[in-house]
Amino acid sequence: SSATYLDPLTAFPIAGTPGVSTTDIINYDLRWEWYREAGNNVSVGLFYKDMEAPIESVQSPAQDGPPLIRIANAESGEVYGVEVEFLQDLAFIGDGIWDNLFTTGNITVSDSEIVLDRQNIVEQTGVSAAITNVERRMTGHSQYVLNMQLGYDSDNGEHSASLVYNVFGERILIPGIDGFDDNFEQPFHSLDMVYKYYPDFNSTVTLRVQNILGEDREIEFNDTLLRSETRGTGIRLSYKYDF
């Protein structure tokens, strides 16, 4: 489709390309898993993806206002890395509250590469500007992603709480053109808290605190801040009753 929409992070327009073809992907995965008592587990996975005609973002020069981002097929691409996941209760530390606490998380460390053909991009999109980096990481790909959760469940089932931390490595958001480098979204450290109280079988009281660290989302170009979004810390209290 050639429809255009605004990216919610950058507010830049993104236009589709009618001739974009489906990406062919060959996956290779190797996984090791260990399940222990009380549901505790750990797993390690290796993966490799070989892609033909991966779908990528390219930048079209803007006459006035923000740049237009177009969607097109690159020539080839690959993604490879390792992922570790785990679930572990904290009862081994001691008695009391430790019996009600658990931690879970996953970390992915990976890399990617795509190859673009400038002339092919021009034929697909009509973009006249020369792509700066014809071999680079995939748009939106971070070399590391970390998700961690500390959870609590009460013995009587009336209370539960979780503290969740997420972070991703810098990633290309706007590919560069005409000799200018790519624009990168910087790591965003997200820390959220959710507490739930179940006074009876039908009711749930929920307290959410989002972005406790007060982090801003930032896009940089050559170590210069291109765009920043201030989100602040959000607090929400809700009540739900199921009939």
Identify what each model region corresponds to.
Residues 34, 59, 76-79:
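Transmembrane beta-strand segments of outer-membrane beta-barrel domains in Gram-negative
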Residues 38-43:
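Outer-membrane beta-barrel domain signature, strongest for Gram-negative TonB-dependent receptors
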Residues 1-28, 46-69, 166-178, 210, ...:
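Surface-exposed extracellular loop regions of Gram-negative outer-membrane beta-barrel proteins
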Residues 47-50, 68-171:
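Gram-negative outer-membrane beta-barrel transporters
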Residues 23-30, 101-104, 132-243:
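Conserved C-terminal beta-signal and adjacent last beta-strands/turns
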Residues 35, 49, 89, 200, ...:
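Residue-level recognition of strand-loop junctions within catalytic nucleotide-signaling folds
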Residues 19-21, 73-75, 242:
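Generic structural detector for well-ordered beta-strands
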